[in-house]
Amino acid sequence: MKAVFDTNILVDYLGGSEAARGELARYRVRLISIITVIELMVGAKDSREEAAIRGLLSSFEILELSAEIAQEAVVIRKELRLKIPDAIVYATARTQGCLLVSRNTRELKSDWPDIRISYHL
């Protein structure tokens, strides 16, 4: 099974969350949006954190922003009123035909198609 992971899952993993670790282990094919890469790297406080992030990123297939993803993000933004980064990450999952795994219950709803709210902190 494959899934696109939202940034919050990776942040939790880097913080030592067992729930995040278990969630990542559920999926054989793990994908992330280039948006997640940007969000993680911007949040790194020092070179040690950057190295930890790069190590984690090496275990994911990173999906670039394509015209197809951009168009789907426009549809999502208009229909669901998500912020642009969230719309791009969700569009990435939809265009790949897989789940978006997140714990973002503020913007995402578990009853939306292709969304898995995996745990709560």
Name every feature range the model reports, one short phrase each:
Residues 1, 27-29, 59-61, 94-99:
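Short active-site oxyanion
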Residues 17, 90, 94-121:
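Acidic, PIN/NYN-like endoribonuclease modules and their adjacent C-terminal/linker elements
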Residues 9-10, 36, 69, 88-89, ...:
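Alpha-helix capping/helix-boundary segments
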Residues 58-79:
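Acidic catalytic patch
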Residues 1-32, 41-55:
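Short, well-structured N-terminal submotif of metal-dependent ribonuclease cores
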Residues 5-6, 32-33, 82-83, 104-105, ...:
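Histidine- and aromatic-rich ligand-binding microenvironments
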